[in-house]
């Protein structure tokens, strides 16, 4: 467990992790502070961060299971202690950590008698089991258990939606709960007198082990920033709200629009304020960059072409696409290597 004393800054806004501990493989805790804040700001930030932590962070989970021996969810299989429904509930609880984009396939192939755990799941290298001891089923007889699984990265809660495969079979859907953050709370400490009264925001985060509390805080912060980016340049647009409302939708400010407006008004482009997920990069490319801590244009320009080629899962055509975008919108060429 890591614990630090709380030192309140009287000048610039700062945040710090004051406590960090791992209670188990599937439970991590972190306590953070942000200060100094003006009266009312701590509650505003705390509420927004809590909602972003609980609802805006992506998680990875098993969403479907398929086996020739399983006719439907409420059946039983001779030689297996648990019912099919219990096995599905156990699969639902498996905690996964991944840099996956979209879906992938996994499988279980075991022969009894033995206990089946998360360690028996055969998955791509991009998917890791957080706790390999998580129980799935108990085989009491020398039978084969073969289950095909679908793993998906998403956010929030998804109801079961039955759907047949191309081969005509019917995989059993699993209610997916893609929520890495188990709980989040905030509290406020006020100090000072009169007009000089200030606040400290305390933020507590519990995760399921697929993310550390610090990683969850970082991702939630970026998700909130992304939501507010269109408003940063809203005053530069001549928007007829009445016409827009009659059409039923408001104008969408694209990456190209914002750059054009900045150039038109002769404003310096704040590279650190332009996030790569606002560009026209494909989601898979964006996720590769994000996993390498490249979140803004400034982060991207700190790398050479060779650096990008070394990023895991980033293909040469992805690098060419990035270079084309930099040249097209910024007339910038990344150096081939760092000197």
Swiss-Prot record:
Record's subunit section: In plastids the minimal PEP RNA polymerase catalytic core is composed of four subunits: alpha, beta, beta', and beta''. When a (nuclear-encoded) sigma factor is associated with the core the holoenzyme is formed, which can initiate transcription.
CDD domains linked to this entry: RNAP_alpha_NTD
Single GO BP term: DNA-templated transcription
Reaction(s) the record says it catalyses: RNA(n) + a ribonucleoside 5'-triphosphate = RNA(n+1) + diphosphate
InterPro entries associated with the record: DNA-dir_RNA_pol_insert, DNA-dir_RNA_pol_RpoA/D/Rpb3, DNA-dir_RpoA, RBP11-like, RNAP_asu_C, RNApol_insert_sf
Gene3D superfamilies tied to this protein: 5' to 3' exonuclease, C-terminal subdomain, DNA-directed RNA polymerase, insert domain, RNA polymerase, RBP11-like subunit
GO cellular component, one term: chloroplast
Name of this chain's protein: DNA-directed RNA polymerase subunit alpha
Keyword Transcription assigned: yes
Organism for this UniProt entry: Drimys granadensis
Free-text comment on this protein's domains from its UniProt entry: The N-terminal domain is essential for RNAP assembly and basal transcription, whereas the C-terminal domain is involved in interaction with transcriptional regulators and with upstream promoter elements.
